[in-house]
UniProtKB/Swiss-Prot annotation:
Record-given protein name: Phosphonoacetaldehyde hydrolase
Family: Belongs to the HAD-like hydrolase superfamily. PhnX family.
Highest rank taxon of the organism: Bacteria
The gene coding this protein: phnX
Plastid found in the keyword field: no
Gene source species: Paraburkholderia xenovorans (strain LB400)
Gene3D superfamilies with a match to the protein in the record: HAD superfamily/HAD-like (3.40.50.1000), Putative phosphatase, domain 2 (1.10.150.240)
Length: 267
């Protein structure tokens, strides 16, 4: 392909772990261990951020902050955030491999991209320790990117563009407009926008929908429709140039962006 040079994927909810389920149980279990229960919906709110800022965002929620204050006699501070993070990470590592199934269609799309000489990068809110549990299984299922940039590899995570800026040179791409960021979270879409790439939101397979594949298929058509529309609206509100149900639907978008670049358009 002449104009599109790279596609940069998120991991959980985008290429693996349909519904982005792996971190949810770990967050809920961790806060419960500290005597401050949180809900799945609360846990999902900051999804896409690095995990320590994610925990900080959860602890800044008024209800959670008040519950913490009631439990410990003071508002949550940096030491508390560190304590929760230190308990969370081993839990997330322990479950990560169990949620490394590649989402249907991803391997075929990766093959199609490579057939068009498009390089494949990835960024993630996961640490390298967590990714070490995921990458081998994903590779065995047909998804093995050219670049992986993790939380901790750059000075800041999402929504800053630093992981994009690190990924592009690793892929040999220097014009951000020639890259596409694909992500299932609002903060991941913002990462792409801030980095100057095209952005594609993933609505059904990821965090914005937040359900396992089997549960999605079991939904009544009207419930599926309103949940899908709500997910689309979230991603569009974050600034996504396109929204697709899953990565399986990506190639027509890539061809459309190729045509737009050929006409001189920019993200």
């Amino acid at each position: 392909m002449k104009h599109v040079k790279a596609v940069i994927f998120d991991w959980a909810g985008t290429v693996v772990d349909y519904g982005s389920l792996a971190p949810m149980g770990a967050f809920v279990e961790t806060f419960g261990q500290f005597g401050v229960p949180i809900t799945i919906d609360e846990a999902r709110g900051p999804m896409g951020m690095a995990k320590r800022p994610h925990i900080a965002a959860l602890m800044a929620l008024p209800r959670v902050a008040q519950a913490w204050t009631d439990k410990y006699g003071h508002a949550p501070d940096d030491a508390d955030i560190d304590a929760v993070y230190d308990v969370f990470v081993p839990k997330n590592i322990a479950v990560a491999a169990s949620y490394s199934s590649v989402i249907p269609g991803v391997a075929d799309v990766a093959s199609a991209l490579r057939g068009d000489d498009i390089r494949i990068g990835t960024t993630t809110g996961y640490t390298r320790e967590i990714m070490a549990e995921i990458v081998p299984g994903a590779a065995a299922q047909g998804f093995s990117p050219d670049s992986i940039v993790c939380t901790g590899d750059t000075a800041e995570g999402r929504p800053s563009p630093y992981m994009i800026y690190r990924t592009l040179p690793e892929l040999g791409v220097w014009r951000a407009k020639e890259a596409i960021k694909v992500d299932d979270t609002e903060v991941g879409i913002e990462e792409g926008i801030n980095g100057g790439t095209w952005t594609v939101g993933v609505s059904v397979s990821g965090n914005a929908f937040g359900m396992a594949e089997g549960d999605v298929k079991a939904l009544a058509p009207d419930e599926f429709a309103w949940r899908r529309n709500a997910a689309i609206q979230k991603l569009q509100a974050a600034g996504a140039h396109y929204v697709i149900d899953s990565v399986a639907d990506l190639m027509p978008v890539v061809y459309d962006i190729e045509a737009r670049l050929a006409r001189g358009e920019r993200p």
